[in-house]
Structure formats: C-alpha cells, structure tokens
From Swiss-Prot:
Its main location: membrane. InterPro entries: MFS_dom, MFS_sugar_transport-like, MFS_trans_sf. Disruption phenotype: Triple deletion of GIT2, GIT3 and GIT4 impairs the uptake of glycerophosphocholine (GroPCho) and reduces virulence in a mouse model of blood stream infection. It comes from Candida albicans (strain SC5314 / ATCC MYA-2876). This is Glycerophosphodiester transporter GIT2. One of its GO terms (cellular component) is membrane.
Length: 534
C-alpha cells in the first residue's frame, strides 16, 4: 500500500500538520504573494489576478444544480406533513411513511456511485446533462404522478418516483460538483475555495431555505383546505432552476484539465485500479468517515427543532409551524457564507475542524443544560442557531471541497461519489439508529434523557470528526488540484502505467499541464500542429 498520507511516527502524527500551515493559511499574504506561490506546471499559463465573469459562470452553472438537493429533499418533509393531514391513519400506519423517506436515500447513493463512474469513464459533461434531465423529469413526476385510483397505488407511485428523483439528485454530486471544482480552479489564488462553496454547499442550504419559504407562501394562497394543490405545486417549482441551468449548461465544455488527463480511452483491463486504490485508500477513508459522521449526527441535531417548536407554539396552526421552519433553516445561511471565506483564509481542513469541534462543544453544553434551556426559549433558540451555523461553517460547506481537492482529475468523480455516498449512508443510518436510542432511553422519571443521550453521542462524534480532520486529513492549499494532478501522473508513470493514454491527444498535449484555463483555441492549434508533424 502507498503510504504518503499515513503518519510515519507518533511525532509526525502529533506535529506533522504544522509544516503545512503556511500553505493553508493565507490571511497574512497579499495578492501578489499568492500569485507568486501559485503552482502552475505550465510556465506559459498566465496566472489570473482578478475574478472575471466568464470564469465564474461555468462554476456557477455546474454547481448550482445542488440547489435541487436542498430544495427537493426538504420539500419531501412538507409533502409528508401534508399527507399525514390529508390521509391520517391510512398514511401514518402504512409502509409508505417510511418507504418514501428511506427510498430517497437509496436512490441518492445509487446516483452518486453510478454517476461517479460515468463522470470519469464515459462523459463528465454528458453525465451532468443526463442528471439534469432526470432531475427535471422526476421532480415533475413526483409532483403530478399517480398510479391507479387507490390511495395505496398513489403511495406506491410516489415511492417509485422518489427513488428515481434520489438517483437524479445523487448524480449531481459527482458530476456538477466535480466540474465546479475544476472551473473554480481557474480563478485567482486566494478566492477559489469561497466560490466553490458558494456555488455548491451554499446552494444546498439556499435550497433548504427556499423550500421552507415556498410552502409557507403557498399556504397563504391555497389555505389549509387545498393541501393537495399546495404540496404538488411546492415540489413542482423545484424543476424551475434545473430547467434554466439545462440551457446554460448546453454551452459548457469539459474543463481543460479533464480533457488533458481523463482516462476515457483506457480499456477496462488496462485501467490502473490497484494503483489508484493504493494511492488514495487512506485519504478517501478519512474524508468518507468525516462525511459519514457529519450526516449521521445531523439527524439527532434536528430533534431539538421539535423541542423549541413545542415550547413556543405547542398547539400552533400549520402556518406558524412552517414559519418557524423558515427561521430554523435561515440559521444555515450565515454559516455557509462565512465558512466559504474561512476556507480561503484558513484552508478547508482547519475550517472544518474548527467548525465541527465548536459544534460538538456547544452540543455537550446544550444537552447538559437541556432542562434549563427548555424554560428559556429565546436563549435556547439563539444557542441552537449558533450551533446550526457552526455545522455549516465547518463540514456543511467544506467536506465537499475537501473531497474535490484531495483527488486527481482522472478519478475525481469516482472519489467524490464514494465519499458523498458514505455521507448519505450515514444520514440513512442515523434515521434508524437515533429513534431506537430514544426509545431505549425513554423515561417517565427523566423525560430529557431520551434526547440527551443521542445528542451526547452526536456531539462526541463531532469532536472525534474534528480530531480526524485535524490530524489525519490531508492539507489543502490554493493550488491543491494542480499539485495533486501532477503527483498522480508522476505516480502512475513511476509504476509502469502508460501515461500517453491520458487525455484526448497525448501526442500534442503535455500531461503535466493540468491548470484549467480558457485557452481552448491554443490547445486546438497545438493539436493541429502535432497532427501535421505526425
């Protein structure tokens, strides 16, 4: 096994991270220093010094599709609430109530893993466009679909389309996020991380907020007498942004780094599977564990929403419940927005560790003081808001950034897809484990215990995740993608893989040149010259 990421001694484990701080922390560097230190394998490439609109729009167009992940996933909660009111015991006592939620996780994992492979081995842009079409189609089918004339047939129909929609959402992760990271890499050093997070993780959080606000407004329009129309329109509106993005994405091209380094032309039997596993097994394990723990813990953190709502509005009408849902979702926005800046100034590794570590500490305090906080609703709401903000400040935005920048371009889709899938599996496991823990510790003498125990567990996992990130996660500098591509190609070459098989035309494109630029015309001219000489 390759051991480049493994600590080679106890001293290396405890203090090895110190030597990389100067690459991660740039808060004390001016723009000229960042330009000078920015690693570019191709000396002819002009380093960007300003953020230009023509460099921003491909990153936005690719990453913004994740808005649907936040919007549609949160909208399903609204759907479930409406179905409970509309159908009562016929819904709550059927398998549909668990199937609709669980099947979405399964579909998302299938989409993440399958399209991770498609993104690397078949077509990166093609995979993104396919995911886009699926997202539009299955969102609309969830909104309007039915099956026969019976209620159970309708529940079965919704379950099937929810699975398909999950596949489409999962497909967006290893296609659009990966493309966004490669285009964000062509921005000036010192500003790359923030734009990636704003166009990916922030879009998910924005989707959560909009999905809470839309049904709140629709409730004013339709009233509680027309909940069927309300939930269908609410879901259907989720297809608007993907439809707009589809036409924008049509004009996009694959990033230059992917064109130069992809392995689409490598036959399956020649594909260096074992070399890839040896090179990435450890860091992929660490990134996947961090993502798993974060999503696993999020479920128990959400239980405190119910406590606050129960104290503020115990018998409130539906519009008040949904209004407070908007408030809770708004807590995510400042965390994700500020975390994007910190990801540039402190680096994503340190930002994630600080955010999730502080979240764990506050989680312990909230759990220990639960009985007192119940009586101070305003204080409870503020503390919970800070708590939720820290979650998005740290892992919420930065875990995807770490997954995209700790892997090389030829395998980034599969690497990202596996890590993201582990995160969704963590969320799925959490939905089953924490209710079981709550039932186990339910007590009439101490009613707080059933909430404190899972919260203590999740907070402890947050601290563990912070330690994993701090001591074992690879450091990520501004030029991490460029350096990782170069190291990976050199590793393949040294281990006997024919690197001339990489990219579109290895006879004319230097595989060491991995910087994303918009110099497509220069590349085309180089290819033509190479073909004439051949």
């Amino acid at each position: 096994m390759a051991s480049r990421d493994l600590p080679h001694s106890l001293n290396d484990l405890a203090f090895g991270w110190i030597k990389h701080l100067k690459e991660e922390i740039i808060i004390n560097k001016n723009s000229q220093q960042l330009v000078d230190e920015d690693f570019q394998p191709d000396e002819d490439v002009t380093k960007e010094t300003k953020v230009k609109l023509n460099n921003l729009w491909p990153a936005f167009a690719s990453g913004a599709g994740l808005f649907a992940d936040g919007y549609v996933n949160n909208s399903i909660g609204i759907v479930m609430a409406c179905l409970k009111i509309l159908y009562g015991d016929e819904f709550t006592k059927s398998n549909a109530i668990s199937n609709i939620g669980s099947i979405g996780f399964v579909g998302t994992v299938v989409g993440q893993l399958s399209f991770g492979y498609i993104s690397d081995r078949v077509a990166r842009k093609g995979g993104m466009m396919t995911a886009n079409i699926m997202l539009i189609a299955f969102t609309l089918l969830c909104a309007v679909g039915s099956w026969g004339t019976t209620i159970q047939g309708f529940f079965a129909c919704l379950t099937v389309w929810r699975f398909c929609l999950g596949v489409a959402i999962g497909a967006e992760y290893p296609t659009s996020s990966v493309i966004a990271s490669e285009f964000a890499n062509q921005l000036p050093a010192g500003k790359r991380n923030r734009y990636f997070i704003w166009f990916t993780g922030f879009m998910i959080d924005f989707g959560f907020v909009v999905s809470a606000f839309v049904p709140f407004v629709l409730l004013w329009i339709f009233t509680e007498k027309h909940l069927r129309a309300l939930w269908r329109v609410s879901i259907g509106l989720g297809a608007i942004l993907p439809t707009a993005l589809f036409f924008i994405r049509l004009k996009m091209k694959d990033s230059t780094s992917f064109e130069k380094l992809h392995m689409k032309n490598v036959r399956y039997r020649d594909y260096p599977w074992w070399l890839i596993v040896k090179f990435y097994w450890f860091r992929l394990t660490i990134v996947s564990m961090i993502w798993f723990i974060y999503n696993f813990s999020v479920y128990s953190f959400g239980t405190f929403n119910a406590i606050i709502l129960g104290q503020i509005i115990p018998d409130a009408p539906l519009w008040q419940q949904w209004g407070w849902s908007v408030v809770f979702n708004l807590f995510y926005i400042p965390g994700s927005f500020l975390g994007a800046f910190s990801a540039d100034y402190l680096g994503p590794r340190l930002t994630l560790a600080i955010g999730v570590g502080l979240q764990g500490i506050i989680g312990f305090i909230m759990s220990a003081c639960l009985n007192g906080l119940r009586k101070q609703v305003a204080a409870f709401t503020v503390v919970f808001g800070i708590f939720a903000t820290l979650g998005e400040f740290g892992p919420g935005g930065n875990i995807g950034l770490l997954a995209s920048k700790t892997s090389a371009t030829p395998i980034r889709g599969q690497y990202y897809g596996i890590a993201a899938a582990m995160g969704k599996i963590g969320a799925f496991v959490g939905t089953w484990i924490f209710p079981a823990i709550q039932r186990r510790y339910a007590s009439k003498t101490n009613p707080d215990l059933e909430l404190q125990v899972p919260f203590y567990l999740s907070s402890g996992l947050c601290i563990f995740s912070a330690l994993l990130t701090f001591f074992l996660c690879p450091h990520v500098g501004q030029d991490a993608i460029n350096r990782e591509d170069k190291e990976f190609v050199e590793y393949l070459r040294k281990n006997g893989f024919d690197v001339s098989k990489l990219g579109e035309d290895s006879s004319s494109v230097d595989v060491d040149v991995v910087k994303d630029t918009d110099s497509a015309e220069k590349i085309s001219e180089t290819i033509e010259v190479g073909q004439k000489l051949a």
